[in-house]
From Swiss-Prot:
Gene3D superfamilies in the cross-refs: Vaccinia Virus protein VP39
Pfam annotation, one family: Methyltransf_11
Assigned EC number: 2.1.1.197
Source organism superkingdom: Bacteria
Gene Ontology molecular function: any one: carboxyl-O-methyltransferase activity
Chemical reaction(s) catalysed: malonyl-[ACP] + S-adenosyl-L-methionine = malonyl-[ACP] methyl ester + S-adenosyl-L-homocysteine
Family annotation (HAMAP family): BioC
Purpose: Converts the free carboxyl group of a malonyl-thioester to its methyl ester by transfer of a methyl group from S-adenosyl-L-methionine (SAM). It allows to synthesize pimeloyl-ACP via the fatty acid synthetic pathway.
Protein family according to the UniProt entry: Belongs to the methyltransferase superfamily.
Pathway the protein contributes to: Cofactor biosynthesis; biotin biosynthesis
The organism of origin for this protein: Methylovorus sp. (strain MP688)
Keywords, ordered alphabetically: Biotin biosynthesis, Methyltransferase, S-adenosyl-L-methionine, Transferase
Residues in the signal sequence: none
Protein name: Malonyl-[acyl-carrier protein] O-methyltransferase
């Protein structure tokens, strides 16, 4: 199977999330839990941002939390799906909308093509969104471009063990992608370094959701818009026989009467380095340190 088979069809992603905007919140249990854990991590960071970007905002709960936390900040809610942005902006109260107490803005765009000025953002936040990017170098390069010097990127995404049970149950041959491919934590760290970020910190956490049957797994994925959007996916109807085969294979994972769905969640944060001062040709910086005092 070629690498192109794993490329994400962005038009399909947009349509899927547009359709899922009304059902997303009820099914996004994992996304909520990860968001709260990211907010706890943010408690440890001393930051007073003037501008915050919520990249891949979904229905906007993180945007609201960031706006409440940083009340003097402009918060930009960015998503590829207009349906999600409409939910985000509709959630603002009437008073906030009439009197401008809520300093939030909505932008429909792709993380890989940010329509924002260079060095305009202090904090980029992204909860479980960058797995929908085709080119991680491009995505991190864009984030690094829009961050101000000493700006912070804080994100979560999905690792390669995500939905490993479903991947095993749906595997047919080596010609079609049945579950999206997710990037390893070490490769993400390498991409951050290539993009110019300072000393990225990453760690991983595993979550297991349980279901009565495989259709419950499928329903939740559909409700949050997480369809298989790989270019190498099977394009036709696969029929009742294939579904029965998937159900039978998934049963091999049943434990204590439940079917598991594993999610590997990768957390990361990294800083954009301070801008360097350009010196005339032939000059180099000299660092002075105070001489240690000595007693006589």
């Amino acid at each position: 199977m070629t690498a192109d088979a794993y490329l994400i069809d962005k038009a399909r992603v947009r349509r899927s999330f547009d359709r899922a905007a009304g059902t997303y919140d009820a099914a996004a249990l994992l996304q909520r839990e990860v968001r709260e854990r990211m907010l706890e991590r943010l408690d440890l960071v001393k930051l007073a941002p003037q501008a915050v970007l919520d990249a891949g905002c979904g229905t906007g709960h993180a945007s609201a939390a960031l706006s409440a936390r940083y009340r003097q900040s402009q918060v930009i809610s960015l998503d590829i799906a207009m349906g999600m942005l409409k939910k985000t902006m509709a959630a603002r109260s009437l008073v906030q909308r009439l009197f401008g107490f809520d300093r939030r803005h909505a932008v429909c765009a792709d993380i890989e093509r940010l329509p924002l000025a260079a060095a305009s953002i202090d904090l980029v936040w992204s909860n479980m969104a960058i797995q929908w990017c085709n080119d991680l170098d491009q995505a991190f390069g864009e984030i690094q471009r829009v961050l101000k010097p000493e700006g912070l990127l804080m994100f979560s995404t999905l690792g390669p063990d995500t939905l490993k049970e479903l991947r095993a149950a749906t595997r047919q041959d080596n010609t079609h992608v049945t579950v999206s491919r997710f990037i390893d934590m070490h490769d993400i760290g390498d991409a951050l370094v290539r993009a110019g970020f300072n000393a990225p910190v990453l760690d991983v956490e595993y979550f297991e959701l349980t279901y009565d049957d495989v259709m419950g797994v499928m329903r939740d994925l559909k409700a949050i818009g997480a369809h298989n959007a790989a270019e190498g996916r099977h394009r036709g109807l696969q029929g009742r026989g294939f579904l029965q085969q998937v159900q039978a294979r998934y049963e091999s994972f049943r434990r204590d009467g439940k079917l598991p769905a594993t999610y590997e969640v990768i957390y990361g944060h990294a800083w954009k380095p301070q801008a360097r001062v350009a010196l005339p040709d032939g000059l180099s910086p000299v660092q002075f340190r105070p001489r240690a005092s000595s007693s006589t």
